[in-house]
Amino acid sequence: MKFFVDTADIKDIRELNDLGLLDGVTTNPSLILKSGGKIADVTKQICDIVQGPVSAEVVATEYKDMMAEAEVLAKIAPNVCIKVPLTLDGLKACKTIRTQMNRMVNVTLCFSANQALLAAKAGASFISPFVGRIDDTGSDGMELIQEIRQIYDNYDYQTEILTASVRTVNHVKQAALIGADVITAPPATLKALVNHPLTDKGLAAFLADWAKTGQKIG
């Protein structure tokens, strides 16, 4: 499974990348706003840190304008992945970006298996189902991941399932068990994956016993 971080915070991205955990980054207009920077500058900084795909989102809603914005974003760095919404214009833009620009495309705001099927047909590199937001409605977001996995396997679609709107470490575990290709999560969630009370307890016991030996290493 690939780990992407869902943030535009340069400090967090650099820290996780230095740990060797990052395969990519996802951003959106809300995260760019939170960063306080300009989209081109922030995206370039991220691309200089992370070698994997860095999703940068168009904000236009019509095909022609989406394509114009995609051209601008693509010039920032070779590893920019153009992010488009799951609309008819977004799907059309996805197809064009993939076939004519030969750039990665992340189709976002997916909430149904039918939408995911359309994105795969359009040649999307990634489909981003929002599991947390589905959970908020009282449904089970992971059921959607299961449905998409089965559909993509049925027809050997190469579109990668990028599990998004990840809120908990359990979301990560469930996505991995189902076979999602990628998860994108906030920095705090990725860091929380390492936590377990028995690990802490065991380490404390080992250190206490080691102190009693009076030894040093090196």
Curated annotation (Swiss-Prot):
NCBIfam families: fsa_talC_mipB. The gene is tal. It is an enzyme of class 2 (transferase). Pathway: Carbohydrate degradation; pentose phosphate pathway; D-glyceraldehyde 3-phosphate and beta-D-fructose 6-phosphate from D-ribose 5-phosphate and D-xylulose 5-phosphate (non-oxidative stage): step 2/3. Belongs to the transaldolase family. Type 3B subfamily. Signal peptide: none annotated. This is Probable transaldolase. Keywords: Cytoplasm, Pentose shunt, Schiff base, Transferase. It comes from the Bacteria. It comes from Mesorhizobium japonicum (strain LMG 29417 / CECT 9101 / MAFF 303099). The active site is at 83 (schiff-base intermediate with substrate). One of its GO terms (biological process) is pentose-phosphate shunt. One of its GO terms (molecular function) is transaldolase activity. Transaldolase is important for the balance of metabolites in the pentose-phosphate pathway. One of its GO terms (cellular component) is cytoplasm. HAMAP family: Transaldolase_3b. It catalyses: D-sedoheptulose 7-phosphate + D-glyceraldehyde 3-phosphate = D-erythrose 4-phosphate + beta-D-fructose 6-phosphate. Its EC number is 2.2.1.2. It holds the Pfam family TAL_FSA. Its main location: cytoplasm. It is found in: Cytoplasm. PANTHER family: FRUCTOSE-6-PHOSPHATE ALDOLASE 1-RELATED, TRANSALDOLASE. PROSITE patterns: TRANSALDOLASE_1, TRANSALDOLASE_2.
